[in-house]
Amino acid sequence: GGLFQPISREGALVLNNLILTVSAATVLIGTLYPLLLETLTDEKISVGPPFFNLTFGFLMAPLLLAVPFGPMLAWKRGDLLAALQRLYLAAGLALVAGLVLFYAENGGPVLAVVGLAMAFFLIFGALADLWFRAGFGKQTASIAWSRLKGLPRSAFGTSLAHMGLGITVLGIVAVTTFETETVVEMKPGMTAEAGGFVLTFDGMRAGQGPNYTEDRGHFTIRKAGVAVADVWSSKRLYTARRMPTTEAGIVTFGLSQLYVSLGDPMADGGLVVRIWWKPWILCIWLGTVVMMAGGVVSLSDRRLRVGVPKRRAKVVAPVPGQVAEAAE
């Protein structure tokens, strides 16, 4: 309770909640506005990715930039300059890591470097918070390590949550920037490239499931001429409802995934094949798990445990006869 300065940990929390509220309202308005407009005027419009990317992205960028500063600020009155001095190394490392990943993925839009650097800044900023809390660089390694182990669980929970956010942002930016889609007509023996891999179409095979029939396509995946994986993709027909579906084949390489989907057959005997390369996509889900773990660790802090009040013992009123006998 009490008053606090804008530059403080309380101020950072207020800024966090304000930006999240405005961002949520923006998404809600963009989702419901077409429905409301159609109900009132019968006019149909579409609100798609351009609107959400322009508004939500620009709203979240300041928040992502401010997140590492929050734990560095003191309660009531913080020192922004001191926080900057503690985070400049993390910012430099984040920029270098962003550039390395950008060029490792063969480039892309220049703004992608900003997004990647911001993601790494969240990760390195969370580690920097633990580093300075433990006193590394000011104390001997043994003392700093002891202090690190003695930090409250809420400190580790906060760092985990911020690292998880950075990992999720890394996955979102990487997929948005470096994702490739290849649509090609293939016949058995033909090849296609995606994500540095060469896929060879080996042919089709009929299959039977418990309640469907399917045509399965087999692909061999090679890297530098060496077979590293294979994948099946199929088109199914559920016999009861006569409902066709396409089952994409998915292969995971580290934190990236390759999707292979069968399209329509062509008149010349070929088959349309769609191949998606989604680099770092698993970071989106990994970051979510890390954020959840951070919340669990924070809630397990002994300082946040609420004690159960002990029941008062019932006092039994003495019987008058027993009191008289005791007095005698």
Located regions from the model:
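Solvent-exposed, non-transmembrane regions of integral membrane proteins
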Residues: 1-328
